[in-house]
């Protein structure tokens, strides 16, 4: 939000837009036949614990399936996805499903599934 000289951010609106976009993407993928009900871990871009908790609740996924690096290392931006995955590698075993999630300022989102 803003213009060429100044960016202004409405954090609440960005949060709401990002969550809505993530849910829309989830629904579209489900309509196309993707079933993530048995995904073992959801590794997300971590801007805050509030955001992760809201996403988990909105998707109906237990928060325990969203490993966090944020409380220890802070917001490390998009690097949180591979960083958190690397921290969880000892918990993963062959055949486990991991969903990587990224949401960019409420404007874009992507998911990628890895079968370990």
Regions found by a protein language model. Give the residues of each.
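Short capping/connector residues at structural and topological boundaries
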Residues: 12, 20, 78-81, 112
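Short active-site-adjacent structural elements
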Residues: 50-53, 78, 107-110
């Amino acid at each position: 939000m803003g213009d060429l000289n100044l960016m202004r951010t409405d954090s609440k609106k960005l949060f709401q837009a990002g969550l809505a976009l993530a849910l829309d993407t989830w629904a579209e993928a489900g309509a196309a036949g993707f079933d993530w009900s048995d995904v073992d871990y959801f590794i997300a871009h971590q801007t805050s614990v509030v955001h992760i908790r809201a996403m988990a609740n909105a998707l109906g996924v237990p928060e325990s399936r969203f490993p966090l690096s944020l409380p220890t290392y802070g917001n490390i931006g998009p690097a949180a996805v591979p960083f958190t995955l690397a921290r969880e590698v000892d918990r993963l075993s062959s055949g486990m499903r991991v969903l990587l999630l990224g949401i960019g300022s409420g404007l874009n989102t992507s998911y990628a599934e890895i079968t370990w």
